[in-house]
């Protein structure tokens, strides 16, 4: 696990985009995440596209998750969010951006189909954010560390955190989502996690330096052979070995 500490969210985004760019240039499949932390990464990837450094015409992408019951064109769906924040600003083909079928009357069947599609295609590099309780995707605390794509009831903290996207009304937030499982996520060849802000500091500390536990789903990344975590100074503020991580980056061969 490589830990990279940058000054602020903009620098985090630049670093993450630089890590993802070689995979995109090679035409590899990428995994995309929603939330506030990846936004600066998407802005930098858009800049690289506009400058002619990248093209996404042949890239396949898989979304981490989707709310159960929200159509793709709903303003709060994650497919729509990713489109508005990223894919519509580059030359992505909409049909190449995959998400769970959130309107399937049998979400469990839809989750199984999505899992198989990811298995068949594979993901070269997965971009992740992290929740304040250590969740990745919608894998809430106590999620199976090797579980497949699933239907997940949302933790009250997650519902509270996401209410800001639903007119600050908790009652409007869906109670369930389909999410890639922790086993699905960690099948990606490479993983990059981004986190910014003091609110994420405890989760980053637990993921990097805490024990492997289902109570902190992100700690499963300790088992992956190729993980890079890019954080700003605020999100790194509770890391006990921050100076060591800075030194290791500086002397890396």
Curated annotation (Swiss-Prot):
Listed InterPro entries: Glc/Gal-6P_isomerase, Glucosamine6P_isomerase, Glucosamine6P_isomerase_CS, NagB/RpiA_transferase-like
One annotated GO biological process: glucosamine catabolic process
Enzyme class: hydrolase
Superkingdom of source: Bacteria
Pathway where this protein functions: Amino-sugar metabolism; N-acetylneuraminate degradation; D-fructose 6-phosphate from N-acetylneuraminate: step 5/5
GO MF entry, a single one: identical protein binding
Keywords, in A-Z order: Carbohydrate metabolism, Hydrolase
GO cellular component terms listed in the entry, alphabetical order: cytoplasm
Enzyme active site: 65, 133, 135, 140
EC number of the protein: 3.5.99.6
UniProt KW Hydrolase keyword: yes
Catalytic activity: alpha-D-glucosamine 6-phosphate + H2O = beta-D-fructose 6-phosphate + NH4(+)
Family: Belongs to the glucosamine/galactosamine-6-phosphate isomerase family. NagB subfamily.
Biological function: Catalyzes the reversible isomerization-deamination of glucosamine 6-phosphate (GlcN6P) to form fructose 6-phosphate (Fru6P) and ammonium ion.
Protein known as: Glucosamine-6-phosphate deaminase
Lineage: Bacteria, Bacillati, Actinomycetota, Actinomycetes, Mycobacteriales
